[in-house]
């Protein structure tokens, strides 16, 4: 994939999903004694204990989603799974000639429509969605007094025309809101391009989750949650999130798992455009095990152009699935290059 920095793309509304998940984790620690208040939106049988969230990070000007994340919360085990979908993923969801998943919001017109289309293509139920212009990210980080991130490499980038200047040294350091956003926007130095940026997001997400747990005050966390929801497009209600958290609090505890949707990047030999092609076999395995798959995967072939052999070859082969625990990320066991 191309390795560039587009200054208009404010990255990682994935912070939002971690905020919600951290609320749940905080509830693990605090173990409130209040009775569960169950809303209709989160009533599940034991077989339907998985709540799936779609989180979108949008560039308000262009309308493209540079961050697409699915997160599942299992209220039986307390486990949370976060799957990042690369922005260059091939996704034919409308009559538009633009066939990347990051353009689906523009093509379909809303987060709700995007959620429905992605739900049908993946074969899973998506219960909640949240789309956010990431200009609020710096305020979020400053609201928690910064986060400590192990920056994987020296990050130096200048674009005076866009008023973008990034100077971060490799190593563990505390980032305020401004520098955190710079960390998230950077991608020119990763050998693996956008996949490297996605892995760096995992460092950020884990650091933010850790910081929110350190705060440990559910009221303070909900205040940040309100800040986010007041600036986003969402169907998430506070009582729904609290209900999910209370369910998880009754478990013996849970873990957070991070993963990138399995597939491979490939350049079109016609247009020269880079795409990321999902592996059908690998996605089916992952969705079945962690996101409560309910329908067949990609019944309408939205994730592949069957007329392009190189795309179809990737789509039909098994690609590696790498899943990281929070501890592995904390211990620098993720190789970012």
Language-model features, listed with the residues they occupy:
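Non-catalytic, solvent-exposed segments at the cell envelope interface
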Residues: 2-337
